[in-house]
Amino acid sequence: PICMKKWLFLILLFPLTCVAQTYRYLGVEDGLSNRRVYCIQKDKTGYMWFLTHEGIDRYNGKDFKRYKLMDGDVEVNSLLNLNWLYIDQEGVLWEIGKKGKVFRYDQIHDCFNLVYKLPMESFSEQPDPITYAWLDENKHIWLCNKDTIFLYNTETQQVTHIKNDISEEITDIEQIDESHFFIGTEMGIHYAKLENNTLELINCDKLESLKAQIIDLYFDKKIRKLFIGTFLRGIMIYDMNTKSVIRPEQNLKDISITQFRPLNDKELLIATDGGGVHKINVDTYQITPEIVADYNSNNGMNGNSINDIFVDDEERVWLANYPIGITIQNNRYTGYKWIKHSIGNKQSL
């Protein structure tokens, strides 16, 4: 009995750990084609799709499959062709690059087909004529150039040319309703109406006065608020109900905001380049750290440069986390809990 008590005492001196993992990492050693991931999507089958520096990867929860993008016999794999990945309302995957090449995923043949490419002879002096590409709710892909917006209809494959009267480099777009849009640029933000193949700018003093390089926009249709992410100027909110601009007190001014993603009805996740992930309450505008690198922890977050963020149905947060690759945070688990005997405290282990 004395020996047994001695061993029991020694065991209780050692830390006990709860083995539930909060974070999981997917890197090149697991099959990811490149550590630099630009976009994350999830299809209706449940596959995760990653647009990387090398091409497109599909992940089934265990294995990766890499897809090549082909223009005839030539593989399209330069940085100018790997820029945006979208899923439309029918669940079809689209990839678009700054050269204006549009690829559509063919589920039957399990490959990406080139369905449109911008006539590059018109842009001989511009190696990357498209500053931003975007898929709207009206089945159009917007290929935004400083002078022209090319609208590619995903159903008819027809392309409409629209004059870009903003005359600034478009960086992001959010749709308000059938014909109204918020358009972010290198210089600021605009309110516009697209009708009869004409983009009409609508004067909005409060928005026009915001002078900042816009990186990401998120419009919450329920509460009619636009969340504005900038380069080194923090976050701003435009409230359409009160026609006012709000600048939260605790702001992220020294880092670049890369992405907003809804976490729930009341909170948005904010991905940053250098500051990890924060969250903002959509009513109070309080900003708090959510997923930030902890290099001293065995199972903590291990990077703060986040290109994209995706929240799935199981509340897992998928992060494009350079230079790691993909980091998955599972909110349903906590990190390691260290339990150890406190010497002199009879109530402790």
Predicted regions and their residues:
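Carboxylate-rich, polar loop motifs that coordinate divalent cations or form catalytic acidic clusters
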Residues: 1-349
